[in-house]
Each structure stands twice: as structure tokens, then as C-alpha cells.
Amino acid sequence: MPRKATTPMMEQYYQIKDQYPDAFLFYRVGDFYELYEDDAIKGSQILELTLTHRSNKSENPIPMAGVPHMAVDSYVNTLVEKGYKVAICEQLEDPKKAKGMVKRGIIQLVTPGTKMAQGPDDSQESNYLTSVVEKAGGYGLAYSDLSTGEIFVTHVKHYAEVVNELLSLRTREVVFAGNLSASDRDRLQKANITVSEPAELEGEHAEISYVQQKLTDSMEKAAVRQLVVYLLATQKRSLAHLQVAESFEIGQYLQMANTVQRNLELTQSATTGRKQGSLFWVLDKTTTAMGGRLLKQWLSRPLLSLDRIKQRQQMVQALLDDYFTRENIVDSLKGVYDLERLSGRVAFGNVNPRELLQLAKSLEATKLIIQTLVESGNPDLEKYGQGIDPQSELAESITNCLVDQPPISAKDGGIIRAGVSEDLDKYREAMNGGKKWLAQMEMEERQRTGIDNLKIGYNRVFGYFIQVSKGNVAKVPQDRYTRKQTLTNADRYITPELKEHENLILEAESRSTDLEYELFSQLREAVKAHIPDLQELGRQLAALDVFVAFAQDAEEKNYCRPSFSSKNEIAVKNGRHPVVGAVLPAGSYIPNDLVMDEDTSIYLITGPNMSGKSTYMRQLALIAIMAQIGSFVPADSAKLPVFDQVFTRIGAADDLYSGKSTFMVEMSEANEALQHASSRSLVLFDEIGRGTATYDGMALAGAIIKYLHDKVGAKTLFATHYHELTELDETLLHLKNIHVGATEENGKLIFLHKILPGPADQSYGIHVAKLAGLPRVVLREASSMLKRLEAEGAREINPSRQQLDLFSPVEVVEENPLKAEQEELLDEISQVNLNEKTPLEVMQLVADWQQALKEE
């Protein structure tokens, strides 16, 4: 938009806006933040603001919109959630004291990856900013949640791993130092990831050296430096809560591509994108927001270290065995607020009095938790409790300073206890004395004037005043009262005596409020020195919260403690899908065993659609993941290897936004397993080859099975409708056939949902189509085609034919075939809802059907 003729204030605005062209500029004017020109036009649409104009009388009025400064956070969050950046421009001096134009400047650039304000729905969500640097030999990745100060860093060799990490982390913003292709930029933006350029800062900053202190790898150091510089440049303040960066190897954890996590629905449903319906939803019995976030992190990075897994299991077992200890801990955890994010607000300087009191209450609750653990009688719980520092002195300093129920704002007074400061107590005494004097004056003036409804009031414009109703104005003593304001129903007056005491009272109030804020700021700075200890305490309580949740899950859902095999064998007795089992009525889920000895690497699974093949496959993956995060699992017993990777081609939600066909996605995911799986991996393939010609698909599926068998050796569950593939067990020694049982009774298909040895004898595809409600004429045609194919032996693989000629004339003749019109009539009859018809209407329908049959 071309710039209009400007005032000095607008010149100042343009100078600041030029520095942040890609951000909405919230420009402080009095009690409002204003947006101008394109920002106003676009912002008014997104934020549903009234679009008005500045300088309406000029030839070129400037589009303008505004938001109250008290409500600015909600408007900023709305923009940031949609992927925009917001520059906050504040008045840097008191307008009353300014000489000329008020000095203004940017105090913070809020971006999707640096959002501090979190709503109730975000309490269990981490908000990651990720930094990526490219150097010879690979890429460094550092990511941080600014609200908690945590920083993690790793390095990878390949660019594809970078993209996978960004998607798996669900990072909100990536700072990328390098050339990003247009297609990758588009892919990230479609995943709601904002791509930003690195920032620059002059000189060295203490935060950088502090967070890098444990790092030795130059690539990781570069990634962390780029991350911290961006945070400092955007937040424009000290970031004392940033934690020492934790370096990790991706190979330390069970690796799962973003598509695998999505297919398995670990943290959100593939259909709704919400928590409900996910494994996280089932397991999340956590009490604190910190515990919920940690559980999510564990689900995305299951352990490979058997020692660490067993340590977690020990804690879960101890809590499972002691109901009363567990319940006491839960009760105490209810009094623990989000210490990690409270620490961040302390560091940012925007923590309010109530939040500091929440911190103190959390520390008091921590004392009870420690006492419960130490007195439990269990050595593991005792040791855990002894390792927690409750920060007792800090809690006392906060509670001794703040009143029990302080207001939210630290600038309005009424937050510091009596006895904390002698000067503050004197000011308050003066204020109270002044207010008593006002009450005494009001009573005396009523007596002097005879005006019973005379009252003394206050506002910020006139200060203290005497208000007299219109009916009593004649009684006002003109020699002492001076009229200051006339209202519809009353007049307001002042007296010399009232103004004299007003000055004393207001001076005491001003000094009291200023001193309270000073004392609060000192307390906040004292708390800031404890941030590292508070963050460590937050981590300990979060982990305890997850252990308690696992114990509750185990008790309520009858989970077992899994053991681990060094011989690469699986033995799950009566295993259940944790999510499906949770939503079905009690006792209705049919459990299944899964036993694969050391010599068996592939189970080839056949059976009809809807019979439960995919559920059975996912069940194993979810049980393995639960086991490797330290949880107990839904089974009577479970013995598992420690898997290093999980690969899936299940198709819970095909990722087609990149422009790839379903078959291309299928082949890409299959290739991931063939290229990277090891003998310690778990591979789940469902209907590989379905997206191409029949024989192409069958040939590819067979070749993939053979490669997995001969070259990879990973534990593999391979579901297929190509029944010809079941003959592979004759040549592949480590492959076995299993199938999902089904039976036919009176022409109806009944799913047994039970895994049985050997291949399925038929697929029951037409029966499933019938359950789906396909028209009878279609089902009849399909049955005819099936009989022709079976008669011709078309199920034998014939390399000379590329596609079955399904629509050639059908020579098979059925007994008493129905006409098409009769098929349609049967469809109509089957769809009638008798509960919605009157007896008379039913009789008329029957008559119509009889007539139709006679005409045919």
C-alpha cells in the first residue's frame, strides 16, 4: 500500500514498520495497540476488529484498527496460532513527561515458535522452535520450548531426517540457515511450520555460553548458537531460564518416522487430529500439565536402554503395589502448578503475584509428596523422594511476603503483607487515617448542611469531591463549596480542606503502590536465582506424575509388566489393542496371542476385511512402544525384544498433500523399511501392492516379502489379500501363515476376531460388500464374475496377462437368476424402515410391490 501524507507519529510508525516488514506491528497509543494500513486491513479480518481510518478528514485517510492493551495477549495469540509474527511496539517513556514525540520501540517479536502465553488447551502441548544448520557431514538440529526453557540438540546425516524430525516434533517454527527448496518450504508450511531466517546479534551473550557448556560437537554448537541468538533477537531481554542444552543421539531411542507415529495414532487421532482416540488419550492419567507433556515426549522417543526401561518399570511396580501411597501422591500433585512454565514467566519478568503464590503452593505440596515417598517403605520410592529438593526457604520467602489472595496485577497495590516493610506500613496507616478522616468529614458535612444524602466520592479526573443531589443544591454553603462538575441528577463540589487532605491521601497511596511494586520486583528477582532448581524439581515431579499414571492404568485396565528377550522372540498372551479395548464395552474385546520364536521373522496374515487384521498388527506395535517407555501393557503376559525401529504401511491417514499417489506413498514407506530396517526392527505392512494392477501388486508384495525374509530379518506382520502368497511358506523357512477367523452361517458372515494358524480359505469380500450395503444387482454381478474367475483358474499367476478382464461376457449361469428390476425391488424392500410407517402405509407398499412383480 502506498504511504500517505504523514504526521510525526506516523513517520515514527513507518520507521519501525520498515524493520519488521513480515510482522504485524502492534503500535502502542495510550490505552490501545493500533494497527495501520495493510496490517489494519488484514488484522481486522482475522481478528474481527472494526476497520476505521486515521485522519478521516484528509484526502488519503489511513486504515486503522485497534485492541485494548489489557486484552492484547489474546489477539496476539490468535495471529501467532495462524502462523503470523507480531512485533509489539511499546511507549518507552511516560507520555505526560515526554518532550515532543513519545519515544517508542519494539520490546518483543512474538513468533509461532516463541509464544509464551499458553491457554488451557495448550497446557500439555510443547511449543517448539527448531534451529537447523548445515555443515560438511550433515545437519545440526536444536529445538527449544521457550515457555519452559528446555533445549535439546542432535545431528543427522541426511536432509530427509531433518524434515522427519521437524514433522515428528510438530515444531511450530524452524530457523533454517541454508537453501530450502520451494517444495520443502511448501510442505512445511502446509504442516503449519513457519520458516524463518536466522537473526544476527553483535557481541557475545552469557546465555549462549551457558547453554553450550556441555556440548563438544561443532555442528551441535552452531545449531544451539543460532537458536539462542534468534530467541535473544526476538525477545529482546535476558533469558535466564534457558537450560543447558541436552545433546542426544537419535539412535538412543526407538526410531519412528512421522508417518509411523501418525499411522499408529500415538498422540492424536488420524481422523480428527485430536487427542481422543490416540494412545496418549488412553494412557494419560497424569495430574499435572508437566506430566502430560513428558508423557508425550516419552511416546515419541521410546527407550532402547534396557536398564532405563527397567528403572521406570520399578517405579511403576512400586506405585502399583501401594494404593494408598499412590493416592496420596495424586492428591498432593493436584496442588502442583506448572513449575516449568512458571519458571519461564519469572525469567521473562511477567509473572504476576498470584502466579508466585501458585509457585509457593506447589513447593508446599512438594513437601507432602516427599514425605509420602520417604515413608512408603519401598526403597525405590524412598530413594526418589530423598532426591527431591522442596525449596522450603523459597516457599517461605514468598508466602511471608505476599498476602493470601493477591490481585493479578502487581501495579495496583494490595499484594504485600503487613510487617514486611516499615515504610509501607506507614503509608498504609496514612491512607487509612485519611479514609477515616473522609468518613468523618462526610458525616459532619451532612450535619452542617442538613443534606442527608451528601456523600464524598473519588475519580481520577477530579480527585475527591462532595456530591449533592439536584434537590438539595439550594442547601449548599456557597462560601465553602466550589462547584467542579454538573451532572444530570447531582452537582459535585470541592473545599480547600478536602483538597488538602486529598493531596496527603493520594501521595500516600502513590508511594504505597510504588513501594509494593518495588518489593514485588525484589521478590521476583530473588525467585529468579532459583530457576534452575525449580526446573529440576519440575522434571522430577513430571516423571513421578507419569509413573503414577502408568500404575493407575495398569490397575484399572489389568495391564501386565512386560519382560524383554535377548533372543529376538515375541510371546504375547491375550494381547489387546489399548485404544480399541478402551472404547469397547467391558468384556467385548476378543484378545489374541502373538508368538514368534527366534526362527520366525514373518507372519503372513490373511482374512476378510473388517476382521481385525490391521488392529492385530497395530496392537503389537503399540504394546512394544508402551513397553519401551516403561509402561505396563494390555496383555496377560508379554515377552518382547527391544525394537530399534518401527516401520509401517498401514494407511491410517495417507499423506497425499505432497502430490504423491496412494501407491507412490505405499512404495515410499515400503522402501524406508527395506533400506533401513534391521533384524531388531518391527515392520507392519498392510495390503502392499493394492494400488496397482493385480499381478504387479502381487509380484511386488512377493518380492518385498522375500527381501525382508532373506536380507533384513526384521519381525514382520504382513497382511494381504493375495492368497497366492500364502504358498511362500513352502520356500521361505522363517515365514508362517496365520489368518483371522471368520465363518458363514445362514448366508451371513460372522467375524471371529481370533487369530488362527494357517492361511484363510477365502476372503469373503462379497460378504463384506453386502455388509456395507451395496445394491443387490452389484453383489449379484460380483458373484457371477467370481465364479467365472474361479472356473477359469484365473487365480493362478499368469505373467502373460497384465490385468484381469473382469467385464467380458459371463458364461456362468446361476439357477433362477433375478431380473435387474427384481433386484432393485429387493433393494427397496430391504431399505424400508417399518418403525417409521403406519399399518396403512405398509399395506399400500405391499400392494405396490405385488403390482410391480405382476408387471414384470
UniProtKB/Swiss-Prot annotation:
HAMAP family registered for this protein in UniProt: MutS (MF_00096)
Cellular component aspect of the GO annotation: cytosol
Family: Belongs to the DNA mismatch repair MutS family.
A UniProt-annotated Pfam family: MutS_IV
Gene: mutS
Disulfide bond residue pairs: none
Protein name: DNA mismatch repair protein MutS
Known function: This protein is involved in the repair of mismatches in DNA. It is possible that it carries out the mismatch recognition step. This protein has a weak ATPase activity.
GO biological process, alphabetically ordered: mismatch repair
UniProt-annotated binding residues for ATP: 607-614
Lineage: Bacteria, Bacillati, Bacillota, Bacilli, Lactobacillales
